[in-house]
Amino acid sequence: MLHPVWGCVVAVMGVLWFYSSGVQSQCWEHSQCRDLASEANILECIQACKVDLSAESPLFPGNGHLQPTSEDIQNYVMSHFHWNTFGQRMNGTPGGSKREGASTALSVLLEALSQPRDEVERESEEEEGLQQHRRDDKRSYSMEHFRWGKPVGRKRRPVKVYPNGVEEESAESYPAEIRRDLSLKLDYPQGEELEEVFGGENDLLNLQKKDGSYKMNHFRWSGPPKDKRYGGFMKSWDERSQKPLLTLFKNVMIKDGHEKKGQ
């Protein structure tokens, strides 16, 4: 059974021989590769071949674009992108392989999907309550710009006028007995006085009806002067001026005289 070191040496030599075959066997012609009896000579030959390949020959001779890149170059290229890191272990050390990173991501996904149902429902209820609170705040903000939204300050009460001349003190501040006495002290018209007041108005209405014309004396259009009725257009023939008609006849007569002279 071969030693692990010799197995690695044989594998590396095979790779170098495969790559060096396309560059006219420059590696095997090197002076350090003629004596391969010892392990030190083999390592020196490998080092010399690597230097020759990197300095004189391309990385992939022939159809190099169809061949996969080496692991070193692939790692160098992938180190510049964030997806080169496939997660971290639980103890804080970076993941060793893609499979470990994928398993870590899968475990995180399973933990997120396996949350209790009550927590999800509670989160949804909190979100709905927050949205409702935002809608209420927006509605109250818009209603503040109108007078029916929120009254500004204290509502002003109407001023009450009392017949006894006391306006500063309200009658509601008095006790019930005093308020009753105040109401009894008010001077209300008696029956005879009411008959005199309404009797005089009835006599006036009867006189107006006897004349045959009922006029609304409380309004300005009850009886306007004749010269101002309908803007002065409803005047009689006698009241109107005769000058426009005389001027018309005069103009007609002058026109007829000119026509006869022309003939």
Swiss-Prot record:
Keyword vocabulary terms for this entry: Amidation, Cleavage on pair of basic residues, Disulfide bond, Endorphin, Hormone, Pyrrolidone carboxylic acid, Secreted, Signal
GO biological process: neuropeptide signaling pathway
Transmembrane segments: none
Taxonomy, superkingdom: Eukaryota
Signal peptide: 1-25
Main location: secreted
Disulfide bonds: C27-C49, C33-C45
Sites bearing Pyrrolidone carboxylic acid, chain numbering: Q26
Protein location: Secreted
Modification after translation: Specific enzymatic cleavages at paired basic residues yield the different active peptides.
Modified residues (Valine amide): V152
One function term, GO molecular function aspect: hormone activity
Compositionally biased region (Basic and acidic residues): 130-142
SMART domains in alphabetical order: ACTH_domain (SM01363), NPP (SM01364), Op_neuropeptide (SM01365)
InterPro entries: Mcrtin_ACTH_cent, Melanocortin_N, Opioid_neuropept, PMOC, POMC-derived_peptides
Family as reported in the entry's similarity comment: Belongs to the POMC family.
PANTHER family named among the record's database cross-references: PRO-OPIOMELANOCORTIN
UniProt-recorded name of the protein: Pro-opiomelanocortin
Gene: pomc
